[in-house]
């Protein structure tokens, strides 16, 4: 059950990250405070995605809290690295994100996946 909560947290956090990325590209920068406030209260697509992203992070924290009660911290924390993989893949697949493929990034994803496999593989207990 803890693994399920952890995976929910990763998926929701990844979607929230993509939502906030969309919002950042469609809202004025915070350095232009009044323009940002005006755009936010106009509640256009950028503002809606900002709210969706923030609510997503809140839901992700709830799932993370539940996961930590049922899963070892070493395993739960390792799951968070999956978010990097999901966001990278989504940025290449989703239209308008212009994510780029590179062998260096693929090598990083392979390292993340290898590490997760090592952490989550069942261990055999040795008797001495």
From Swiss-Prot:
The chain crosses the membrane at residues 1-21, 36-56, 77-97, 101-121. It is found in: Cell inner membrane. Its main location: membrane. It is a multi-pass membrane protein. One of its GO terms (cellular component) is plasma membrane. GO terms for molecular function: carbohydrate derivative transmembrane transporter activity. Residues 22-35, 98-100 are periplasmic. Belongs to the ArnF family. HAMAP family: Flippase_ArnF. This is Probable 4-amino-4-deoxy-L-arabinose-phosphoundecaprenol flippase subunit ArnF. It comes from Escherichia fergusonii (strain ATCC 35469 / DSM 13698 / CCUG 18766 / IAM 14443 / JCM 21226 / LMG 7866 / NBRC 102419 / NCTC 12128 / CDC 0568-73). The lineage of its organism: Bacteria, Pseudomonadati, Pseudomonadota, Gammaproteobacteria, Enterobacterales.
């Amino acid at each position: 059950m803890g693994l399920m909560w952890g995976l929910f947290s990763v998926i929701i956090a990844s979607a929230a990250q993509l939502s906030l990325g969309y919002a950042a590209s469609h809202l004025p920068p915070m350095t232009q405070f009044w323009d940002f406030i005006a755009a936010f209260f106009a509640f256009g697509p950028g503002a809606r995605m900002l709210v969706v992203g923030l609510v997503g992070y809140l839901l992700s924290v709830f799932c993370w809290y539940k996961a930590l009660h049922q899963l070892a911290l070493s395993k739960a924390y390792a799951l968070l690295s999956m978010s990097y993989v999901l966001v990278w893949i989504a940025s290449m697949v989703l239209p308008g994100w212009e994510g780029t493929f590179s062998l260096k990034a693929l090598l990083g994803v392979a390292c993340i996946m290898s590490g997760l496999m090592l952490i989550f593989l069942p261990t055999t207990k040795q008797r001495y």
